Amino acid sequence: MEAKAVARNIRIASRKVRLVVDLIRGKQVGEALAILKHTPKAASPVVEKLLKSAIANAEHNYEMDPNSLVVGKVFVDQGPTLKRFRPRAMGRASRIHKRTSHITVVLNEK
């Protein structure tokens, strides 16, 4: 049985979120939460909140034991890009891409 949680349109570039997500793939849930707690990246509180949501989904919806959960699949997809302009010298402007990401966490029982 799998329990899943998805966070969409997170305002952090997917390349940066993947650095955090790669740390917890395949780990037990308690260990993954400890790793995220001590990771000094902007994406780690977001991934930690999503992992807690997946644990709650497993407990409530599927009646799984939270102590026997393992992070099965975790992946980050690119979301829509917000396009903005930054004023530059001599009346010009350059385009800025504010990237978003979709994060998915799937938990399995050990």
UniProtKB/Swiss-Prot annotation:
It comes from the Bacteria. Keywords: Ribonucleoprotein, Ribosomal protein, RNA-binding, rRNA-binding. Signal peptide: none annotated. GO terms for cellular component: cytosolic large ribosomal subunit. GO terms for biological process: translation. Pfam families: Ribosomal_L22 (PF00237). GO terms for molecular function: rRNA binding; structural constituent of ribosome. PROSITE patterns: RIBOSOMAL_L22. Part of the 50S ribosomal subunit. NCBIfam families: rplV_bact. Belongs to the universal ribosomal protein uL22 family. This is Large ribosomal subunit protein uL22. It comes from Brevibacillus brevis (strain 47 / JCM 6285 / NBRC 100599).
